[in-house]
Amino acid sequence: MKKQKIAVLGPGSWGTALAQVLNDNGHEVRIWGNIPEQIDEINEKHTNTRYFKDVILDENIKAYKELSEALDSVNAILFVVPTKVTRLVAKQVAELLDHKVVVMHASKGLEPGTHERLSTILEEEIPSEMRSEIVVVSGPSHAEETIVRDITLITAASKDLETARYVQGIFSNSYFRLYTNSDVIGVETAGALKNIIAVGAGALHGMGYGDNAKAAIITRGLAEITRLGVKLGADPLTYSGLSGVGDLIVTGTSIHSRNWRAGYALGRGEKLEDIERNMGMVIEGISTTKVAYEIAQELGVYMPITTAIYKSIYEGADIKESILDMMSNELRSENEWDKK
């Protein structure tokens, strides 16, 4: 593929890792961020020590403080900013764009208040004549592993498969591989909701429960993620793929996951405000829990794990009691899709 100019909006751990993948593939990569010291560090020292202590970035990766400079003549834009600021950044991008670009995002969350998926936000804020159909880049991936070129397989989802294949082409190489998918709703809801289940899985570990309990919360978590996703229009088969069960496994079982670590601390009795302060990073699963709970209540979708996590975080319920209460819920069939 011809060399592309790509703006990566957000110099966090995942944005930095994806920037390196694109750079490895010979593309011109421009990272944009709003913390001047971090931008200077990337340009002068070729490091981003806030997230990676021992990683040296390629000197061809450039960072920008001015969004207009990062967007100048680019072929594609990759949003990797926190969910809560995606709309704000998209508005800024829309004001500056003077040509049509491919628009991608690699964030995982649902917007508080509106309950909207991130692709919907980007569609609303960036005029259709200035962008492609949105492409969602999502799947089982720890930035800490991708940045050291460990093998990673994820999904590129879009309503337009030609655009998804373009994104597949700019990213894929010997250690990083993308598969295309047309189920944007499924891929986005899977990526957002698995963070809630990861909080629960971490909490179980923090409370001292074993592998049986962790396997249970992951598999039943997948069931309720699928339940809500299908209600919203997703294909249930998507949840058996990389962006579904794959992402849930990697997030719900690893200390690399900030959502798992947050749950672990909650399970050990730490206060949420202390956890967020100590981690110093966005814990998307916390805000997503509230959004998912509200959607489930509105649509009448049964989500007991999400409800238990919600009550613990937002209503002050004891997390151990909330989780144990699920054991007395009405007995059900495992295969709710079986019509027999």
Curated annotation (Swiss-Prot):
Residues annotated for sn-glycerol 3-phosphate binding in this entry: 108, 139, 141, 194, 247, 257-259
UniProt keyword Oxidoreductase present: yes
Active-site residues (renumbered): 194
Catalytic activity as recorded in UniProt: sn-glycerol 3-phosphate + NAD(+) = dihydroxyacetone phosphate + NADH + H(+); sn-glycerol 3-phosphate + NADP(+) = dihydroxyacetone phosphate + NADPH + H(+)
Entry keywords, A to Z: Cytoplasm, Lipid biosynthesis, Lipid metabolism, NAD, NADP, Nucleotide-binding, Oxidoreductase, Phospholipid biosynthesis, Phospholipid metabolism
Primary location group: cytoplasm
Pfam families: NAD_Gly3P_dh_C, NAD_Gly3P_dh_N
Entry's localization field: Cytoplasm
GO-annotated molecular function: glycerol-3-phosphate dehydrogenase [NAD(P)+] activity; NAD binding
Keyword Chloroplast assigned: no
SUPFAM superfamilies listed in its UniProt record: 6-phosphogluconate dehydrogenase C-terminal domain-like, NAD(P)-binding Rossmann-fold domains
GO cellular component: cytosol
Matches recorded under PROSITE patterns: NAD_G3PDH (PS00957)
Binding site for NADPH: 13-14, 108, 143, 258, 282, 284
Assigned EC number: 1.1.1.94
Pathway recorded for this protein: Membrane lipid metabolism; glycerophospholipid metabolism
Top EC class, one word: oxidoreductase
GO biological process, one term: phospholipid biosynthetic process
Family note: Belongs to the NAD-dependent glycerol-3-phosphate dehydrogenase family.
PANTHER family: GLYCEROL-3-PHOSPHATE DEHYDROGENASE (PTHR11728), GLYCEROL-3-PHOSPHATE DEHYDROGENASE [NAD(+)] 2, CHLOROPLASTIC (PTHR11728:SF1)
HAMAP family referenced in this protein's UniProt entry, alphabetically: NAD_Glyc3P_dehydrog
Protein name, entry field: Glycerol-3-phosphate dehydrogenase [NAD(P)+]
Source organism: Streptococcus thermophilus (strain ATCC BAA-491 / LMD-9)
